Amino acid sequence: MIFHKEGSAYNLGIRLADKINEWLYNYEHPIQVHIGSDGDPFASHVYRHFMEQTPERDNIKYSILTNGLMFKEFYNTVPHVINNLQELGVSIDGASKETYEKLRLGGKWEKIIEGLECISELKKKHDFRFILHFVVQKDNYHEMEKIIDLGEQYGADRVWLNKIEDWGTMDDFRTQDIFKTPEYQHTLAKLVQRIHKRDDRFIECPTLISEAVRYKNKN
């Protein structure tokens, strides 16, 4: 992802964004365009340029994955995307100020809450799917139920909880591997009880369940 506004990488990104928009303008069949997954798109000048210039066409639907911190500041600059938004995902790995600001370096709890409030209001108007994504790890597993509460509070359609994975970017991934500890197992059991009580698909945690099953079968 490109965060600056100069240099060859930025210029190449702008040209590519314009080419994609030109292609979208002439494309007549239904299509969904996903924006994000490699960083926050609202923090990228190239992504923002793409979203600002994208054509308004009924056949184009959009999905966005964002960390939510800059959404309120920039959503009104990309009306064509918001008007045709099908799904908005927010990655948030803490359900309290202390945990959130520990895991999201530079992030402010008050700002993400403002973002969630803004998204909640926009959802009422545009009726897009709103999903929270929560990566479970050592410093936040105790907030698995709290993130469910947060999703309910701000009108999310679903909350995804996924086990942290080792992508080779951590110095010692073993320090994050809390998934066999009694404390984590107890917390997961409470979450599973809550899933059964809801009897719907608001809470999704397939990687957590499969990990627990593997651990149980080994023992």
Regions found by a protein language model. Give the residues of each.
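Radical SAM enzyme [4Fe-4S]-AdoMet core and its adjacent flexible, acidic
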Residues: 2-18, 48, 60, 79-219
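Short beta-alpha junction loops
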Residues: 68-70, 165-166
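Conserved Radical SAM active-site core
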Residues: 2-63, 69-80
